[in-house]
């Protein structure tokens, strides 16, 4: 392009109209080409800057952003409905425009042609930030670098604006997007401004929330403001209401608002200190202001971004000025060229206007306007792609763990072994195999080993199965390599301080596992002796690291590698490659080897790999092969920059890692020096390292003649060449760990790496012990001259000052592979200068069993005794923020190490410690925030939090700035304590309290406290309403401040007073009335805090008289130190003014329930809160006690609920405890106590109660000052799960022949079928004879049509098949078979009779799975009936269950008989319907609207819209009628759509589950079936039906109701459900009955408890009248069974817990707060026994140790009830199957003692 043209580059504030996802995909794809190098750099920088900014977000916002490794990943996520919508949209627009700009130049291979004298940049809104990056650039490379700053500022701007704007108006509770800006066309700015001024004045809108003009041009005006205010303004003004206007897609808040933002806000967004551009960088190109149309005056980058920030936040956009500025530029510079050019990113309405103006101007002057689109290039094909080079970050090893021979079960023991020069080889232990039978040194015995030696780890079978959620059976079948991979992975992560999700690099989706494994001994030998369920997952190699990913919920890559002897180090190299490729951010890698199989010994011996004389003799002249070894090792690796950002301890740095192959070797197993040399050089070149700078090499060193000779040659040639020779001070030391611990095969490389890491840590190279006689003569003779040699004694390896030591680790595979790692020292960490002033620190310890918790506590105590200098701050940081927390917990907040030691000793010395120890509950308790009133005010409240926590400080400052913009004084001096604690004005007092409380609530949210409800006491209710989203924070501040002003103006301070009385309202009245001198005294009840704590108010003298009178009666009274008496007549003078102020304020439905002390209830709706509510709340009584009681009655709170007192001092805490004595209450601040200490104690309490706070956020402000301590590792509760190899069958098989196995059954559902509907999918068998027919069909409940029908009826958030589904299937099959026998029949009328459903069918939640069921039908014309049975089937084998889950009979009948029967009943039914209508009109029966009726249904079942056919209902106890209209859509292929059947019949379910006559709080009602179901004609959509039912108790079963449902069309009965039955079921069993299936096997025999479905409310358990013994089966869900239950093998005895045994299948996971723990003398066993006695009706004395549950009548239903009661009342989470695994009282109590 000719640079002489005058040019404008226009950056829009709108995305191009193209498919945005496609644009970003193309941009991403093009960036991979070497041609677009600068584009690639820009996108990488933008990704990095966004990662950095996201990492700085508060955790609640951070969690909204999925892990991403490119901007493309973010472009595919819809953020619009969340609080990050503006931030993401702004930054992505900036990235897109700058990316297109850079790519355009690279695509054209064009020179930078933006000449400052002839180029002007322009943009609107966010587009100016992209333009700024170009304005600061003098080359395209500069744009790539500077663009990241534009991205940073645009993201920060979006976050900041959204945060401020939510304080002006809360988002809609349902997430609906509302526009903050409307455009009005065909009007003038002055006209619109007049209308807005009038609206703002009339409504007395606060300045902050006024509606204003944000942009204007000659044809349109943009109006901005809070959405509700804009709506009100347009309704208020006829001119606006009838104008042409449209909402703009501005959903995240306000910009261009000079009344809202100040310089502080601009500085907060720009934050020049974090800029990636030098602040004094010069502005190179003119950039036009969108406000003035003139170039910004800024000369430097800092000035430019500040000016832009000012314009974006406070300036009005005037598009006409921008256009004029562009025209002026062209006019000044177009005369010489005759041409001008506008570059843009596609076109837009704004740009077309600019084109039009420019062309109109220049046409007269015969000038040419050139338009250039900078987006077109991205769609071009540039030929074959040439990729960029790979990433080259350094990598950091941050954690390691091992199980190695010689008892080296941890790193300290491993180092001790090396330091002492120990040789660990022994003969093969008997638990592996018997040398007496399997060892033959002559080699004559087939399959016998010729060497008896090896190196073995201790106790390979020991494992903590309960910790890893494995049953004893699964643990036993699982390869010890897999088990120890889990264990060492955990220990390595523990050392590394990895807490999944704590940082971006440790997000579970970004963590991968890579393990090397080269043998399957356990699967092939030990476990194969009795192959069981877990044979495949327990033995196949892929499950070794797959199990790690699954247990820890990592979704990054999972690879198991086999490269023979180098597998372990090759896995590390593959892991490093994944980090360099960006496939993961954290990797866990290692090698695994546990020897058990003599076959491998034999094979290796016969191939001459193994030494017959003992250990590996590395570099010894008598080297004769290697000695086999066990080994398990794991390391944790990250990119160096991530490790540093995460504050990790770095053990060493990986500079390079490579693997190649010895392709030119003389044989596949022979090493090749040339290949080894090539691999070393590749690694050195990768890192840019001089080989002579390497000072230590850990050799592969197997002790074979060929291997040692070749490796010594390759190492000396590369690392110690003859020339250039090493200097004397450049000694190269060599070592080989195999001489100590043998050759671990797949674990050999990881063992070598662990040794090298320890060498770095200890600054010592341990002695080499491989040379037993003399050095191998094949080793090069000139090694010493080359300054190379083995470390024959322990040799210091000091780190030279200012330099880093380099080391190499080798590992070679017998198949020819060579792997090499290059390491260097970790960066020297300069710990930030501590400004630590926290006086109290939380220290936490946890475990998954009592034994482990106690051992962990003992370990820490021992560590502290040995390390008294330990920093408490570091210890708190390590145990809280850098640990995964488990169900058994100990925690305390202490101020010094001795205090911690004392607390630990106190607990450990407590003889009742084990019995008192309780796991946390499976579900975290609910949390209610209680906001205090103004009585707790003092200067410096929250001071330490304000100083210490930037987030809290920012919240306070933002709220304070809003208050100041509203005309109120700053409260910061009150918060930070810079003003004296003296009487302050009501305005300052009340505003500071409300600001503190709102900031505290958000701080608690930052710390991970999820809020279930809020309650506010008096003034605190304003904060509660703001936090619940009812009013905005700005409106809360406005109302509180203006209310305080009204009080000051209209009330006299000191004329009234308030008195707190420790007595009830009635008691006060009675005592005062009993005395003549006090009987007439006037007072009012201001607050009913508890039923024994009342606040009264009135005239000062009269209140004083009351105080003296009550104190004379020994009643405690406290005169409150307040100048005014709120909630009394003194407030009358302000009420009208307050209500008027609140009238314009928008009130929204609360996002969380609000407990209202005024209404004494919990509020969920949008109508309860309004201006009148605030008036009443100021004047009327604060009934705090009644609000809490209502919350209890409604089930919102219970004894386990945690209450957080939010305010300056815990006043509400005492009130809550007064109502709920056992309540756990924590504080936010406390007078005369450091607020960080208060928060620390509260967080510990919450942690122990079952919440897991975001400890990382608590330590985040000072994280760089803390060090991660290397504390003792987790103490496992281990049991030996070893399957010994029995016999000599590995020898015997040499003489046996092998057979074959049959091919497994294959199920196919893809064949054509003569009958196929939405529910009946395929005929599998059909037989038709003269008068009989049989049909078998199969259906998949996961088929979309079937699944959608099921999900139309959900219970407990699970789709449950309604019996209308079985009805349609019965009618479908019935008509099909009947027509097969009677082909010419016109209509088939069917009576579906004797329906009995034994098991509920719950839709599974596993995507891609099948959930088949089989329907078997047999029709007999001689009886005109058809029997039906439904069965579950196995999804893999097709095997049908032995027993059906439902049965029914279809009778083919004459409808004439039905009409006659119903004609006799019609007048009775119509009479009852009319009577119900009359009672409803008289108010004696309830008339329910459609929404209310189905809202009542939601107590048990949630129907989809298509099922909601009832338009209205009249309900009178157990009788009801409904008007019904069926939806027109059939939604599938059916005989009779299930949603139509349900709509006309489920009235019975509503009666049972929604009537006041039913106890729906404790029970729900479900149906096991009905006697008949008939329809005279097919149901029709649009026709109005009526349903009627009257339910009644059945005399034969007190828990059962029955009734007939009549279906009427007009005045005639057209259908009937005869005797539909409903059974009453305890509500606490809801989870048991209605949970998705978890397995895919065929169900075994049904237990005596069953769940069934039918019309109305469709699922029920049925139990025998007499309890029967539970059958000996164990299912994952013994009630709801979708063909999903495993039989317990008869040979497997029930678990018998003991101190020696492992955890049974279900371990409890629960730990309530300390305040709820049982008395030590009243231990858990006695509590459980009492509960069992109560529930079974037995005496406690009958529950003896040898009594069996079968004998006691505890059947499967009772076991379910007991397990739920244990959970609900005792906090113990066990499943009912435990009653089978522990069949006697004695076994059960032993289990409880150990695990509860």
UniProtKB/Swiss-Prot annotation:
Region of interest (Product template (PT) domain), residue spans: 1317-1636
Necessary cofactors: pantetheine 4'-phosphate
Sorted UniProt keywords: Acyltransferase, Multifunctional enzyme, Phosphopantetheine, Phosphoprotein, Transferase
GO MF term set: 3-oxoacyl-[acyl-carrier-protein] synthase activity; fatty acid synthase activity; phosphopantetheine binding
Malonyl-CoA:ACP transacylase (MAT) domain: annotated span: 931-1251
Segments forming domain Carrier: 1719-1796
Domain PKS/mFAS DH: 1321-1631
InterPro entries on file: Ac_transferase_dom_sf, ACP-like_sf, Acyl_transferase_dom, Acyl_Trfase/lysoPLipase, Ketoacyl_synth_AS, Ketoacyl_synth_C, Ketoacyl_synth_N, PKS_Beta-ketoAc_synthase_dom
Active-site positions on this chain: 565 (for beta-ketoacyl synthase activity), 700 (for beta-ketoacyl synthase activity), 743 (for beta-ketoacyl synthase activity), 1353 (proton acceptor), 1542 (proton donor)
SMART domains: PKS_AT, PKS_KS, PKS_PP
Biological processes, Gene Ontology terms: fatty acid biosynthetic process; secondary metabolite biosynthetic process
Enzyme class: transferase
Pathway annotation: Secondary metabolite biosynthesis
Compositional bias annotation for Low complexity: 1697-1708
Enzyme Commission identifier(s): 2.3.1.-
Region (N-terminal acylcarrier protein transacylase domain (SAT)): 18-256
The name this protein goes by in its record: Non-reducing polyketide synthase nscA
Organism: Arthroderma otae (strain ATCC MYA-4605 / CBS 113480)
Gene name of the encoded protein: nscA
């Amino acid at each position: 392009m000719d640079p002489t043209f005058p040019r404008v580059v226009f950056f829009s504030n709108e995305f191009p109209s193209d498919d945005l996802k496609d644009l970003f995909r193309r941009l991403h794809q093009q960036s991979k080409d070497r041609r677009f190098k600068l584009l690639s750099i820009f996108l990488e920088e933008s990704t990095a800057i966004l990662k950095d900014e996201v990492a700085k977000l508060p955790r609640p916002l951070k969690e909204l952003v999925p892990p991403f490794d490119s901007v493309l990943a973010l472009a595919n996520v819809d953020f619009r409905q969340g609080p990050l919508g503006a931030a993401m949209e702004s930054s992505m627009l900036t990235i897109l425009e700058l990316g297109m700009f850079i790519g355009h130049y690279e695509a054209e291979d064009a020179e930078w042609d933006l000449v400052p004298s002839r180029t002007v940049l322009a943009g609107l809104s966010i587009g100016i930030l992209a333009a700024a990056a170009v304005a600061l650039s003098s080359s395209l490379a500069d744009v790539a670098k500077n663009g990241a700053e534009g991205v940073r500022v645009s993201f920060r701007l979006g976050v900041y604006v959204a945060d401020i704007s939510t304080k002006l108006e809360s988002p809609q509770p349902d997430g609906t997007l509302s526009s903050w800006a409307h455009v009005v066309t065909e009007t003038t700015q002055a006209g619109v401004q007049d209308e807005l001024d009038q609206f703002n004045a009339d409504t007395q809108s606060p300045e902050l929330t006024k509606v204003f003009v944000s942009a204007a041009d000659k044809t349109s005006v943009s109006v901005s403001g809070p959405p509700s205010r804009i709506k009100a303004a347009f309704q208020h003004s006829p001119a606006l209401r009838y104008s042409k206007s449209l909402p703009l897609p501005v959903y995240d808040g306000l910009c261009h608002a000079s009344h809202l933002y100040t310089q502080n806000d601009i500085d907060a967004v720009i934050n020049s200190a974090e800029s990636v551009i030098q602040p004094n960088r010069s502005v190179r190109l003119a950039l036009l202001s969108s406000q003035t149309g003139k170039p910004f005056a800024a000369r430097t980058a800092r000035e430019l971004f500040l000016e832009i920030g000012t314009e974006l936040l406070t300036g009005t956009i005037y598009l006409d000025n921008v256009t004029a500025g562009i025209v002026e530029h062209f006019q000044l510079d177009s005369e010489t060229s005759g041409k001008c050019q506008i570059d843009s990113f596609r076109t837009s309405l704004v740009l077309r206007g600019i084109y039009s103006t420019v062309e109109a101007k220049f046409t007269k002057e015969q000038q040419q306007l050139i338009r250039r689109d900078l987006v077109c290039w991205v769609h071009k094909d540039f030929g074959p792609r040439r990729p960029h080079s790979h990433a080259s970050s350094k990598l950091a090893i941050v954690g390691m763990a091992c199980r190695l021979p010689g008892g080296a079960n941890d790193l300290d023991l491993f180092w001790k072994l090396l330091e002492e020069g120990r040789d660990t080889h022994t003969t093969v232990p008997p638990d592996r195999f018997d040398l007496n039978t399997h060892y033959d040194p002559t080699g004559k015995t087939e399959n016998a080993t010729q060497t008896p030696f090896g190196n073995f780890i201790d106790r390979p079978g020991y494992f903590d199965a309960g910790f890893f959620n494995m049953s004893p059976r699964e643990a036993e079948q699982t390869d010890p390599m897999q088990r120890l991979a889990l264990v060492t992975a955990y220990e390595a992560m523990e050392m590394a301080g990895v807490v999944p999700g704590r940082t971006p690099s440790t997000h579970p989706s970004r963590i991968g596992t890579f393990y090397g494994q080269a043998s399957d001994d356990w699967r092939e030998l030990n476990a194969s002796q009795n192959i069981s369920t877990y044979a495949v997952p327990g033995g196949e190699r892929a499950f070794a690291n797959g199990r790690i990913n699954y247990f820890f919920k990592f979704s990054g890559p999972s690879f198991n590698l086999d490269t023979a002897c180098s597998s372990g180090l090759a896995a590390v190299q593959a892991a490093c490659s994944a980090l360099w490729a960006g496939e993961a951010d954290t990797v866990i890698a290692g090698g695994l080897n546990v020897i058990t199989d003599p076959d491998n010994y034999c094979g290796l011996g016969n191939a001459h790999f193994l030494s017959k004389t003992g250990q590996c003799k590395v570099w010894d002249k008598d080297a004769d092969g290697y000695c086999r070894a066990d080994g398990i090792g794991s390391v944790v690796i990250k990119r160096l920059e991530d490790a540093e950002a995460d504050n990790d301890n770095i053990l060493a740095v990986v500079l390079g890692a490579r693997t190649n192959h010895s392709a030119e070797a003389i044989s596949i197993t022979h090493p090749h020096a040339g290949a080894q040399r090539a691999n070393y050089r590749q690694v050195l070149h990768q890192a840019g390292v001089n080989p002579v700078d390497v000072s230590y090499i850990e050799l592969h060193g197997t002790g074979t003649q060929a291997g040692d000779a070749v490796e010594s040659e390759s190492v000396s040639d590369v690392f110690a060449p003859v020339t250039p020779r090493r200097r004397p001070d450049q000694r190269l030391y060599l070592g080989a760990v195999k001489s100590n611990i043998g050759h671990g095969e797949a674990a050999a490389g990881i063992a070598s790496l662990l040794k090298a890491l320890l060498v770095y840590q200890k600054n010592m190279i341990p002695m080499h012990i491989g040379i037993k006689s003399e050095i191998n003569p094949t080793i090069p003779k000139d090694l010493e001259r080359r300054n190379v040699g083995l470390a024959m004694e322990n040799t210091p390896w000091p780190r030279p000052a200012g330099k880093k030591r380099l080391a190499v680790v080798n590992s070679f595979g017998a198949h020819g592979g060579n792997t090499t790692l290059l390491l260097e020292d970790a960066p020297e960490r300069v710990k930030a200068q501590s400004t630590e002033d926290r006086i109290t620190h939380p220290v936490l310890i946890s475990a998954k069993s009592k034994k482990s918790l106690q051992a962990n506590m003992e370990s820490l105590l021992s560590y502290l005794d040995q390390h008294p200098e330990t920093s408490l701050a570091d210890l708190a940081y390590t145990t809280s923020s850098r640990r995964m927390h488990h169900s058994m917990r100990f925690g305390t907040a202490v101020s010094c190490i001795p205090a911690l030691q004392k607390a630990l000793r106190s607990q450990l010395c407590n003889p009742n410690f084990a019995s008192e120890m309780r796991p946390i509950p499976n579900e975290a308790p609910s949390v209610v925030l209680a906001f205090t009133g103004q009585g707790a005010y003092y200067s410096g409240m929250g001071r330490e939090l304000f100083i210490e926590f930037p987030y809290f400080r920012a919240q306070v400052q933002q709220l304070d700035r809003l208050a100041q913009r509203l005309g109120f004084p700053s409260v910061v001096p009150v918060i930070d304590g810079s003003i004296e604690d003296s009487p302050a004005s009501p305005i300052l007092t009340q505003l500071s309290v409300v600001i503190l409380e709102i900031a505290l609530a958000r701080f608690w949210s930052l710390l991970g406290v999820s809020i279930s409800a809020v309650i506010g006491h008096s003034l605190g209710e304003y904060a509660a309403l703001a936090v619940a989203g009812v009013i905005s924070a700005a409106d809360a501040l406005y109302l509180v401040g203006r209310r305080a002003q009204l009080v000051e103006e209209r009330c006299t301070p000191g004329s009234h007073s308030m008195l707190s009385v420790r007595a009830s309202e009635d008691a006060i009245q009675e005592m005062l009335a009993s005395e003549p001198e006090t009987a007439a005294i006037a007072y009012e009840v201001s607050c009913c805090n508890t039923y024994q704590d009342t606040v009264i108010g009135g005239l000062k003298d009269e209140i004083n008289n009351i105080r003296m009178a009550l104190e004379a009666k020994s009643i405690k009274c406290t005169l409150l130190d307040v100048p005014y008496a709120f909630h009394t007549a003194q407030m009358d003078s302000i009420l009208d003014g307050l209500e008027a102020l609140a009238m314009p304020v928008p009130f929204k439905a609360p996002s969380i329930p609000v407990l209202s002390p005024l209404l004494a209830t919990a509020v969920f709706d949008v109508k309860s809160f309004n201006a009148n509510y605030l008036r009443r709340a100021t004047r009327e009584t604060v009934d705090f006690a009644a609000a809490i009681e209502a919350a209890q009655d409604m089930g919102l709170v219970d004894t386990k609920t945690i209450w957080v007192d939010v305010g300056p001092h815990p006043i509400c805490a005492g009130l809550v405890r007064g109502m709920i004595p056992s309540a756990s209450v924590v504080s936010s601040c406390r007078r005369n106590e450091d607020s960080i200490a208060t928060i620390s104690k509260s967080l510990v309490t919450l942690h122990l109660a079952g919440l897991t706070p975001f400890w990382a956020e608590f330590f985040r402000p000072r994280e760089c000052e803390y060090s991660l301590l290397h504390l003792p590792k987790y103490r496992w509760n281990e049991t030996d799960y070893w399957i010994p190899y029995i016999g000599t069958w590995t020898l015997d098989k040499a003489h046996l022949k092998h057979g074959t196995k049959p091919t497994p059954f294959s199920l196919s559902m893809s064949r054509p079928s003569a009958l196929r509907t939405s529910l009946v999918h395929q005929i599998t068998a059909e037989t038709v004879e003269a008068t009989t027919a049989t049909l078998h069909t199969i259906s998949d409940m996961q088929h979309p049509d079937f699944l959608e029908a099921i999900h139309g009826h959900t219970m407990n958030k699970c789709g449950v098949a309604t019996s209308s589904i079985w009805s349609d299937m019965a009618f479908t099959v019935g008509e099909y078979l009947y027509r097969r026998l009677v082909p010419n029949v016109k209509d088939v009328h069917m009576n579906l009779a004797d329906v009995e459903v034994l098991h509920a069918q719950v839709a599974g939640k596993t995507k891609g799975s099948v959930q088949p069921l089989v329907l078997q039908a047999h029709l007999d014309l001689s009886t005109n009936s058809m029997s039906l049975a439904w069965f579950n089937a196995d999804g893999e084998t097709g095997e049908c269950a032995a027993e059906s889950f439902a049965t029914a009979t279809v009778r083919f009948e004459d409808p004439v008989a039905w009409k006659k029967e119903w004609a006799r009943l019609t007048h009775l039914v119509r009479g009852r319907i009319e009577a119900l209508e009359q009672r409803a009109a008289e108010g004696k029966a309830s008339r329910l609207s459609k929404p209310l009726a189905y809202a009542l249904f939601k107590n048990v079942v949630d129907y989809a819209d298509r099922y909601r056919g009832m338009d209205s209902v009249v309900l009178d106890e157990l009788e009801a009628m409904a008007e019904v209209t069926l939806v027109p859509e059939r939604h599938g292929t059916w005989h009779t759509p299930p949603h139509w059947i349900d709509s006309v019949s489920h009235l019975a379910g509503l009666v049972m589950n929604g009537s006041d006559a039913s106890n729906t709080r404790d029970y729900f009602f479900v149906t096991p079936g009905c006697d008949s179901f008939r329809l005279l004609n097919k149901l029709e959509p649009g026709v109005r039906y009526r349903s009627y039912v009257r339910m009644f108790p059945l005399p034969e079963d007190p828990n059962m109701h029955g009734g007939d449902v009549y279906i009427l069309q007009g005045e005639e009965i057209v259908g009937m459900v005869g005797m539909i039955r409903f059974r009453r079921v305890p509500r606490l069993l809801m989870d048991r009955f209605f949970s998705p299936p978890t397995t895919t096997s065929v169900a075994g025999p049904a237990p005596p408890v069953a769940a069934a479905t039918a019309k109305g409310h469709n699922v029920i358990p049925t139990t025998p009248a007499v309890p029967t013994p539970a059958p000996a089966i164990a299912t994952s869900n013994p009630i709801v069974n979708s063909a999903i239950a495993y039989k317990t093998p008869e040979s497997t005895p029930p678990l018998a817990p003991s101190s020696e045994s492992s955890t049974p299948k279900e371990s409890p996971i629960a730990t309530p707060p300390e305040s709820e723990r049982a008395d030590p003398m009243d231990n858990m066993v006695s509590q459980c026994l009492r509960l069992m006695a109560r529930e079974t009706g037995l005496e406690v004395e009958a529950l003896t140790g040898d009594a069996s549950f079968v004998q006691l009548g505890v059947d499967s239903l009772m076991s379910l009830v007991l397990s739920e009661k244990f959970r609900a009342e005792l906090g113990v989470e066990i499943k009912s199957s435990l009653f089978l695994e522990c069949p006697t009282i004695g076994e059960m109590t032993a289990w409880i003692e150990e695990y509860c």
